[in-house]
């Protein structure tokens, strides 16, 4: 059994592959002002197993990043010493520490029961409220339409996020009470889908591999070994294969209409005679090693 297989208390996740993948930069949003990303997943640790290297990179580049977890992972253990309430409190604290390590600004927990998440009207309203309040240009979430077998909560949060983004966040009369509260409509520019079977967007997060290891190990209730050096060694060894890199994380990039902030900046640039260069979204023909599903143990 490999170290990575032995590290986790239940099933071992993938950390992303992409040894030969072309590496993409996060697409420019057409402005030089604040850039905000909101990562939304079902359980504490879901974001970090698949995307912690990229999150650390974007935070270091000046992005404001928020985490949103639909549940607190209150069923994710085999340890009989935990009650659901104790486990939820533990995992919330672990997630806050992992987010601190990476530079995430704030973590939100929506409090839904682990294992029973549904894309309800209530959940959609909460997500729309977050989008209209914090104005992310980019949203990162699970690919809810991935065809292979995976956790039901992962599928449900991916679907819920898409339904909240379009058309509900854009159109004022969805959840019209927000308008009365001063929360206007909002348009998100990009969606990055984790765990997609056909990723087209690859981030070289090699300089942040140690931060990713620290974020993973912050989820202490979910790992059975805390050997940081060995974890880093194993993650690096995956990238030393021919043509490889130390840490590449893969996403399916979906472009939506430009956000209001980007539209305003793009219009100003057009008036000044400035145009944005066209950039490739990545490597659609990346090898299978870049397409491995990324899923946390819980």
State what each model feature region is.
Residues 1-134, 270-272, 288:
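Active-site rim/loop-helix segments in enzyme catalytic domains that contact anionic ligands
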Residues 2-38, 118-298:
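Metal-dependent de-N-acetylase/amidase catalytic core
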